[in-house]
Amino acid sequence: MKEEECSPLLSQDTAGREHPLTRNSPPTANIPCPAPWENQKGSWGCRCCPGAKRQASGEGQASSLPLSTGSNCVKYLIFLSNFLFSLPSLLALAAGLWGLTVKRSQGIGWGGPVPTDPMLMLVLGGLVVSVVSLSGCLGAFCENSCLLHWYCGAVLFCLALEALAGVLMVTLWKPLQDSLKYTLHAAIIHYWDDPDLHFLLDQVQLGLQCCGAVSYQDWQQNLYFNCSSPGVQACSLPASCCINPQEDGAVVNTQCGFGALGLDQNVAGQVVFLQGCWPALQEWLRGNTGAIGDCAVAVVMIQGTELLLAACLLRALAVHEAAEDIEAGPL
């Protein structure tokens, strides 16, 4: 090295002695600036992910600061609860997709007389719940603040939608009743057109022990059960209208309602249910208002608890990251 030149990594004092540059020494043009986040491992490519600052760039050693016991409990509680919620939602999603696939293979269209396709509702509900639950599950397990922030936003959005639905249900109760009654009539008319509609209406009639929308005579609106129909089901009713469809046997007698529409009301009342499903549904709602309210409050409380736990975990992760930065010191 020539006498008039100095090393780019060394500085000289007035006596000509060389000594290493200190931390406060100005940078020189010969020293390249290290690339940001160089030599870091474990990052998912997101600045808010936990692995982004877990290793020192020079030493390559991970920080040894663990989460506190309370934060770990919150973390695994969020993971377990959302994992349990994701299982039935994924099952519902799979069942809905299977049902839609079967319907398409049978040539049944997406549109129908009822406002919404039951299988499509099952798919959408299962998809929303599974995506939200899995984001909370993975966000807590991986300590990923990006997913946890998204999870909190999704839960808040669901709570807002539920509050809006409650307000609309109270303010628009009368139009909702009329719409539900119309849906029952439409389901009767198109009973044989959609297997999902067929199944749901049968379950409603069996569960509420009713027949038709307002009375059992509403089945006259169906082309197959109308008394003027030339088919074998003329003046008949579905087996789900029968008081004892199995007739004390193991197999349902699908012909138990044959000819019931042509019978006298007193005679027909011994074979089938005469009350319509709409009055029966109103009576059921009045008798179970308290239970429905308790379920709604429980759902809101569960969502609020999950939101609070996620916020606590986010705060703990922020404090933990700040502590790691302090422990690592300036680079």
Curated annotation (Swiss-Prot):
Ranges facing Extracellular side: 98-120, 174-331
Disulfide bonds: C210-C277, C211-C241, C227-C235, C242-C256
Main location: membrane
Glycan attachment points: N226
Residue segments, region Disordered: 1-34
Residue ranges of the TM segments: 77-97, 121-141, 153-173
Keyword check for Glycosyltransferase: no
Molecular function per GO: enzyme binding
Keyword Membrane: yes
Cytoplasmic side: 1-76, 142-152
UniProt topology in membrane: Multi-pass membrane protein
Protein's cellular compartments: Cell membrane
Gene Ontology biological process terms from the UniProt entry: protein maturation
SUPFAM superfamilies xrefs: Tetraspanin
Keywords of this entry: Cell membrane, Disulfide bond, Glycoprotein, Membrane, Transmembrane, Transmembrane helix
Stored InterPro entries: Tetraspanin/Peripherin, Tetraspanin_EC2_sf
Gene Ontology CC: one annotated term: plasma membrane
Family membership: Belongs to the tetraspanin (TM4SF) family.
Function recorded in the entry: Part of TspanC8 subgroup, composed of 6 members that interact with the transmembrane metalloprotease ADAM10. This interaction is required for ADAM10 exit from the endoplasmic reticulum and for enzymatic maturation and trafficking to the cell surface as well as substrate specificity. Different TspanC8/ADAM10 complexes have distinct substrates.
SUBUNIT field: Interacts with ADAM10.
UniProt protein name: Tetraspanin-10
Native organism: Mus musculus
The gene coding this protein: Tspan10
